[in-house]
Amino acid sequence: MINISVSEFMILCSSVLLIFLLLTEVLDWTQLFPWAEECNFPRYTFGYADRNGPHMWKMLYPDSNGSNQSPINVATRLAVVVQPSEPLRWTGYDKGPLSMTITNNENNVVLNTMWSSSTRPYIQGGCLTNVYDICSMVFHWGHSNDEGSEHTFDYVRFPMELQVWHIKRGFNSLLDAITAKENDGILIVSFFFQITNADNPYLDHIVTNLWRIIQPGTKVHIPPFPLLWIFPTFERDYYTYNGSFTQPPCSEIVTWILQPEPIAISSSQVAQFRKICSQDGPILFNCRPVQQVNERSVYFYA
């Protein structure tokens, strides 16, 4: 029997963890596990500064002039109330991915995950007529704690919005869904954040690593964790409407689900996001202005 002291055991555990973290930085998981899948984000040229902000997008991305654009203001009293025959059903969000990265794509912080084809989380039921597989998660924030969400509820903003992107099952990539131009090709579930005095310990898995991606174009691996740690699943009491991406190419192929019950975040945690830089300096605001609802209906699934 091997005798080992507590201090030696702790050193051993720390060494194993360090080796694991180093491996996540250098390994190409798609080569190590050919069946692993990661959602690659198409690259489009845009920004939020005067020279490349939303008022300039229409010059390069004609879809941004469409009549079903996002984000919108949700007038809660005008929402059509629906009693669904079945709840939203979430599968796999309580499991950890093979690997996880955060990226400064020069406009947002993007959380990407890699899964085996059999373990990728998906959502179905409720307002959905298709199955949607997880893709990417995108954070939006603002100059202050009074703004930062792209969507508004009765013209009230939250300090941050997390958009969880999904692809309709059958498409091989986000780019395939964009190219197909099916009006239900993408599902984005938005979660909103509310300032609290205490840090949200679950968000710390991301926040404590933001200093590593301050420079534009940087990407780092972080220890993987279940997505359920940063946003809760839900079955009912959500808003939904048909719209577009809130960033180029602004394709009108998105089913939006908005969860109005906010997630806790502290002022100091939000402040770490404002240190992220683009080529124009710190990203202090990365939200598109709300768009006209026009003839669309917004539904509330009770």
Label the model's feature ranges.
Residues 2-302:
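Alpha-carbonic anhydrase
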